[in-house]
């Protein structure tokens, strides 16, 4: 019954997102100076959920560092097109950006998503290696930020990868950009009350991956790379970013939190979904500079 209710609500939200995206793309043009190679099949199976867009600067297209971006949507909805302008903006900061689609819950669970995105990150890593670069950076918003943390942590923690039944990504993860992260999935809140069974599978509390459902434990166990977190007044998951930053900062001073307390409230994932706004331009500029320092 709960899953049926979630599906129905998700369908409505997906329709709203599509309407917003169509309007936003009409109003905000795609920037000049960016070359888009769309819908590359990174799994080789022809499925729409396994397509990936690649954004390259028109000038010096094979010289910049490689960045992989994961869209948000709470694992239930979302699509790579929502982050189209964000990826183009990061491309203008000098990155070649890989933005993969991935299958969504409840059709699949989180471990399936991990496996598929591992292939996408490895593809991006091959491009980085061809450029003589040692690894890639990851960035994501909301659920995409969670995916950055977990894929990076599993690379450094074989026991965690084994508990997930996932082969770790091959390239070194040099740094993370985490926008409005949906880091916590099992708390007693509006997310944790319904999502865990669909995300981790029924009976997840008795399985080896359970300790890693706590992102703070995951970050400590996985030796998280330098991370730049973005949130703001108005972000309904602002407390997640603040709490997660406090947790990871106990172990390393390499992390940074940009917490905007401006004159107006900003929406969740504003930096990814509205990159043309002044606040997002500033946030993304700071994040790009942080990532470039670690590439």
Locations of the language-model features?
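Alpha/beta-hydrolase superfamily serine-hydrolase fold, recognizing
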Residues: 1-295
């Amino acid at each position: 019954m709960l899953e049926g209710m979630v599906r129905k609500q998700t369908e409505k939200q997906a329709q709203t997102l599509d309407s917003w995206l169509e309007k936003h793309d009409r109003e905000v043009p795609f920037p000049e100076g960016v070359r888009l190679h769309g819908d590359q099949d990174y799994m080789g199976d022809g499925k729409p959920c396994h397509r990936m867009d690649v954004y390259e600067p028109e000038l010096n297209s094979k010289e910049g560092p490689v960045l992989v971006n994961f869209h948000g949507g709470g694992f239930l909805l979302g699509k790579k097109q929502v982050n189209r302008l964000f990826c183009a903006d990061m491309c203008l900061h000098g990155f070649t950006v890989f933005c993969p689609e991935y299958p969504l819950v409840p059709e699949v669970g989180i471990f399936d998503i991990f496996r598929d995105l591992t292939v996408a990150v490895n593809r991006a890593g091959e491009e980085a290696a061809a450029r003589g670069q040692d690894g890639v950076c990851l960035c994501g918003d909301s659920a995409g930020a969670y995916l950055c943390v977990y894929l990076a942590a599993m690379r450094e923690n074989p026991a965690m990868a084994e508990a997930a039944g996932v082969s770790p990504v091959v390239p070194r993860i040099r740094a993370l950009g985490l926008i409005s992260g949906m880091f916590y999935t099992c708390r007693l809140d509006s997310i944790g009350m319904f999502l865990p069974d669909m995300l981790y599978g029924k009976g997840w509390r008795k399985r080896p991956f359970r300790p890693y459902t706590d992102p703070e434990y995951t970050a400590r166990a996985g030796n998280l790379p330098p991370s730049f977190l973005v949130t703001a007044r108005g972000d309904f998951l602002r407390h997640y970013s603040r709490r997660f930053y406090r947790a990871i900062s106990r172990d390393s001073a390499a992390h940074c939190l940009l917490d905007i307390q401006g004159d107006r409230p900003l929406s969740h994932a504003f930096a990814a979904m509205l990159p043309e706004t002044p606040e997002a331009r500033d946030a993304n500029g700071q994040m790009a500079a942080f990532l470039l320092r670690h590439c």
